[in-house]
Structures are given as C-alpha cells and as structure tokens.
Amino acid sequence: MSKVCIIGTTTWGITLGTIIAHKGREVMLWARTEDEAMLLSTQRRPADFLPENYHFPEFMNVTACLEEAVAGADMVLLAVPSQRMRPNIRLVAPLLTKSMLICSAAKGLEIGTAKRMSQVITDEISPDFAKNICVLSGPNLAMEILKGLPAVTVLAADTEKTAKKAAKLITAANFSAYTNTDIIGVELGGSLKNIIALGAGIVDGLNLGNNAKSALITRGLTEISALGAALGANPLTLSGLAGLGDLIATCSSNLSRNHFVGVELTKGRSLNDIMYNMSNVAEGVSTTAVAYEMARSMDLEMPVTENIYNVLYNNADPKEAARILMDAQATHELAGRKWNLFKMFRKRKARKTPELNPD
C-alpha cells in the first residue's frame, strides 16, 4: 500500500489526506504535540472542522512522532502556511530518502527572501533529493472538496516523470490532477492570485458589481502574468488551472479566506483585528507585501497590487483604492502575439499607448 505523510493538520492538509485515504492509500498526519495527536485520533476529526458530519477515513491516522510519520512514505506533503515552511522542512529533511517525493501544498512567498516554497525546500534538503520536489496548486476550495464536489489540481515538478508520479498518488474520485513542468508559473499563480482575491473581496464588500469584479480579475491576471514572465514563468501557465482557474475560484467564493479579509476591510475593521480573529491564515496578506517589494525592485508597474498594499499597510481607504483602480487611463489593453509583458509593465514617465512589436 502506498503511503503519504502529511505535515500540517491544517484544513488543507486534512482535506488532502482525506482525498488520498479515500483512494485506499495510507495517510499519516503529523501533529506537533502529543495532546493534538491524541485528540484527533480519539475524535477522528478536528473540534472546529466543517462539515459537521466529517470524520477521518479509515486509512488516515495521526501521530506526534515525526519519524513514524515519515518512515516508509512515498511522498511527504507539506500543507503548512508559507511562513512556516522553512522550519517544518528543516525538521523533515534528515528523515528523507532518495525515493521520497517532497510536495509543497502551500500558496505563498517567504517574507524576507521572496522565495517560492520549492526554493525554500531546496535550500533545506540534500541536493541529491532536489529532483523529487513538486508542488500542488489549483482551484481547490477545501470545503467543496470535502463535500465530494469535483475539483482538479495541478502537480508541477522540474520533470514530467516526477510530476506524473506525484499526480498518481494524489488523483482520486472527484479530484483529478494535471501535470506541468513550469514549477515557477504554477507556484506564482497560486501565490499571487491571493492578492487579487483581497481586491475582489473589497469590490464585493463595496457592492461595486460584477462588471467591476470581472475587470479587477482580468487586470489582476495581467499583473500576475507580467511578474510571472519577469521571474521566468511561462505566461500560458498563468492562464491555466494554477493561474486563471485558481484566480476565478478564489475571487468568486465566500469560502476564500483572502476574499473574506477584503470584505471585512470595507466594514472599517483593522487588518490586525481581522487576522487575530481568523482560525486560518490568509496568505494574500503577506504575499502582497512580498510582491509589492519585488515589483518595486524590478521597476514593474502593478497598480492592483500597489493599491491593495496601500489598503493593508498604509491605511488607505478601500473605497478610494477601488476608485483609483477603476479610473485607469486609456492605454493599450491587448496582449498580442509578440507582446512583451515585462516591457509593457515597465514604468513609463510619459504614459503613452505602447506600440506592438513589429512583425
């Protein structure tokens, strides 16, 4: 029987464990304390977990012993907040073997380094195991998946062989996995879309309508593609499941934590108050800060990100930020066959309509 070790008793970690265990594979969840492991093992569910009728499937168990959790695993799947990825992979690294896949299911960028999660993992494990790193990302709202509703995801790795091996372990009824070798694009799509989801929450909180939200999502995708291209991603990846697909799901659903934060900001609540009272992490808050600094250092114009940053960190009025975003100047909107997204978003002193590259 195949075995998957999941690091992180988060909502997403438990959801992924449930998917995998329902397929008849052994899943071992690692809990950080004996008390947590005992409680989860006894109740077979988290105390505050929804839906109410949820219980761990037969082949999913919990342990506080990291060695027991990792031993014999075909994959170690890290479903932890992005700012906790480095300390967790440091604990796991000495227990890895050359045959184990190491999969990140986190959607964020590390504060201070601006690194993607696969880069953080690479920093902390033996170079001999780097070929086994993969990432999971896509339009995956946990509560829908736990209700048995269909969803798809993307498994990305540097090689198609590794991506397919990971996808085979993850794929189950109502949860299909596509593969991709553009690990940069898949990770950036999953991370950066959370910024736009914050904006979508603001638009919804202000009751600005679907026209405004569709404009925000579309311009947000252009920003994601511009930054992604500058960092080495394939822009086509960002129009796929891990980019546009995840963007639509997160911006359209009340189940999204980042969308929730955006809505609450329009009610006059402070960011600290919102975050303090949330049981889960809204990754978009930290990702906005990282992406904002990256854009500045690369001289990339990212107006959506800049305005969301000002709302989060400079106490800008959400209503004024939305007005600025909807009051764009008449510039070229098309991305043609030979359009250079990086140059298109380079800041220009004279805001002229950019010219298409000649044939």
Curated annotation (Swiss-Prot):
Enzyme Commission code: 1.1.1.94
Reactions this protein catalyses: sn-glycerol 3-phosphate + NAD(+) = dihydroxyacetone phosphate + NADH + H(+); sn-glycerol 3-phosphate + NADP(+) = dihydroxyacetone phosphate + NADPH + H(+)
Organism: Dehalococcoides mccartyi (strain CBDB1)
Pathway: Membrane lipid metabolism; glycerophospholipid metabolism
GO biological process: carbohydrate metabolic process; glycerol-3-phosphate biosynthetic process; glycerol-3-phosphate catabolic process; glycerophospholipid metabolic process; phospholipid biosynthetic process
Major place of residence: cytoplasm
Keywords: Cytoplasm, Lipid biosynthesis, Lipid metabolism, NAD, NADP, Nucleotide-binding, Oxidoreductase, Phospholipid biosynthesis, Phospholipid metabolism
InterPro entries: 6-PGluconate_DH-like_C_sf, 6PGD_dom2, G3P_DH_NAD-dep, G3P_DH_NAD-dep_C, G3P_DH_NAD-dep_N, NAD(P)-bd_dom_sf
Cell compartments where the protein resides: Cytoplasm
Enzyme class: oxidoreductase
UniProt entry tagged with the keyword Metal-binding: no
Annotated binding of sn-glycerol 3-phosphate, by residue: 107, 138, 193, 246, 256-258
Keyword presence, Oxidoreductase: yes
Cellular component, GO annotation: cytosol
Protein name, as recorded: Glycerol-3-phosphate dehydrogenase [NAD(P)+]
MF-aspect GO terms: glycerol-3-phosphate dehydrogenase [NAD(P)+] activity; NAD binding
Family: Belongs to the NAD-dependent glycerol-3-phosphate dehydrogenase family.
Active site: 193 (proton acceptor)
Annotated residues for binding of NADPH: 11-12, 32, 107, 142, 257, 281, 283
Protein role: Catalyzes the reduction of the glycolytic intermediate dihydroxyacetone phosphate (DHAP) to sn-glycerol 3-phosphate (G3P), the key precursor for phospholipid synthesis.
